[in-house]
Amino acid sequence: AVLPFVETHAAQTGCGFVSNLKTSLEIGSSPHITSGASVDVIMRNVVYALLPVCAFAVYAFGIGAALVLVTALASCLATEHVICRMTGKKSTTGDWSVAITGLLYGLTLPPGLPLWMVAVGGVFAVAVGKALFGGLGYHAFNPALVGRAFLQAAFPQSMTHWSLPFADDRFTSIPSSVMAFPFAEPVYDAVTAATPLAQMKFQSIQAENPALLWGLTAGSTGETGFALIFLGGAYLAARNMLNWRIPISIMLTASLISWVFMQIDPVAYPRPAFT
């Protein structure tokens, strides 16, 4: 938008000279100071940082995790394309932003979640979490988390079933719950596991540091590979696409608060490394 011209008149004493100063002010959305890197370049590098996490998720949870990730990505891409066509806009599926949404959304889901639920959540993430607010740069919440929150509210039982990582048959069989028919009660495998957070909350059991670091615990598809998540963040920081002070400040603050509470009751509250 362009503001109306601002007109000022300055009279110069003694000579009667009057000058008209007209200034055009433009209002645009952030960022106002850029690094010179395009949106495509930044988004593509974020995808690169996520790929090792996705690969580890497939390695740890097998075919089920791969199907969840592919379905999440495909549903988000398809929804973005359809919405662009319906609104008469050029398809934005090539700017990598919706690919990030699809990958992040898939990485937050249980590896045994039925694929039809994954697809429904992907549609909701893009249609409501992103497009409803005006698209890239205008959404109030992370679209991937909007999709996950929707599934958590709509299907709480399915969103709290966790597969055991590194199962012997993870590459030779597909979890029965993944292929469940829409709105049918999914049948989960007998072998399930509690997340470290659930074990700490209900049993006061803290997972060992090596297990947390190398992803030897149950959890969402992409949350267990902490080492690779950390390396992905370091890659983005090295490329000047991430302010390293923000995640480091969050981790240090969480560790400090955890340490304070651990001093009060070391049984009820986890150690800083767990947090």
Where are these regions (language model features)?
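Membrane-interface helix-loop-helix junctions at boundaries between adjacent transmembrane segments
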Residues: 97-98, 103-174
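Structural signature of hydrophobic alpha-helical transmembrane segments
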Residues: 63-74, 112-120, 217-225, 269-275
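N-terminal signal-anchor module of multipass membrane proteins
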Residues: 2, 6, 14-77, 84
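Long hydrophobic alpha-helical segments that form multi-pass transmembrane helix bundles
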Residues: 141-229
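Alpha-helical transmembrane segments
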Residues: 238-275
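Hydrophobic alpha-helical transmembrane segments
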Residues: 44-47, 67, 71, 222-236
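Alpha-helical transmembrane segments in multi-pass membrane proteins
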Residues: 45-53, 68-80, 97-102, 106, ...
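C-terminal ends of transmembrane helices
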Residues: 78-90, 126-137, 231-240
